[in-house]
């Protein structure tokens, strides 16, 4: 089985468009559909035909092009069961623990409520790929619009249980801001400082910072490091529950 091909490009202002292509079957999935034009140009540039859309949550900047792409390609739209009514063109709803096939490969659904109530991630265990959209960012997490911090912390624990070498594709190019914020709560983390410097250089050159890995996030993402003594001491939360430390970090980011 040949490796999947992945193309990443910008949509709107900072959304990532992601296409996942199987060179043997020709199957091509879009991870969300933020904007019609960039997706069509990417497909045309490769000579790919869209067969699937894997929707992660209902926000407009992730579903805007669902209907026009479905009308053009007759592709199959997957999306979260708990947000089914809000997903344009939905064909198959997916709940936590569901599994389906894409081009003969297993796709596992992980419910990650927090950013929205029904947000899901798509995990391809045999390929070591996680499509996390607006749950997990490089050195960050999604803003909590519909569920409390405790729910997002539970979602993060699910993702932290994946293999460290899992490649993570996220939904927005927020990495520079995330890195700068992470340094304010984890200033003594040498790995974080080195990564933040690399990100500064990459973004100055207009280079993307995607993908990341679960292992790298465990080392540098403050939301995954809530048990770290240095972070807790810096926040004045030495004896707090993990979920409370997570919530404090998210609150500080909201005001950063």
UniProtKB/Swiss-Prot annotation:
Q: Name one GO molecular function term.
A: metal ion binding
**Matching CDD domains:** hydroxyacylglutathione_hydrolase_MBL-fold (cd07723)
**Which reaction is catalysed here?**
an S-(2-hydroxyacyl)glutathione + H2O = a 2-hydroxy carboxylate + glutathione + H(+)
Q: Where does Zn(2+) 1 bind?
A: 57, 59, 115, 134
Required co-factor? Zn(2+)
Recorded metabolic or biological pathway in which this protein acts: Secondary metabolite metabolism; methylglyoxal degradation; (R)-lactate from methylglyoxal: step 2/2
Family from the record: Belongs to the metallo-beta-lactamase superfamily. Glyoxalase II family.
> What biological process terms from GO does the record include?
methylglyoxal catabolic process to D-lactate via S-lactoyl-glutathione
Instruction: Supply the Gene3D superfamilies for this chain.
Output: Ribonuclease Z/Hydroxyacylglutathione hydrolase-like (3.60.15.10)
> What is known about what this protein does?
Thiolesterase that catalyzes the hydrolysis of S-D-lactoyl-glutathione to form glutathione and D-lactic acid.
Indicate which residues the UniProt annotation says bind Zn(2+) 2. 61-62, 134, 172
Instruction: Enumerate the InterPro entries for this protein.
Output: Clx_II_MBL, Glyoxalase_II_hydrolase, HAGH_C, Hydroxyacylglutathione_Hdrlase, Metallo-B-lactamas, RibonucZ/Hydroxyglut_hydro
Q: How does it assemble?
A: Monomer.
Q: Source organism lineage?
A: Bacteria, Pseudomonadati, Pseudomonadota, Alphaproteobacteria, Hyphomicrobiales
For this UniProt record, the keywords arranged alphabetically read as follows: Hydrolase, Metal-binding, Zinc
What Enzyme Commission number(s) does the record list for this chain?
Answer: 3.1.2.6
Q: How is the cofactor bound?
A: Binds 2 Zn(2+) ions per subunit.
**Protein name per Swiss-Prot or TrEMBL:** Hydroxyacylglutathione hydrolase
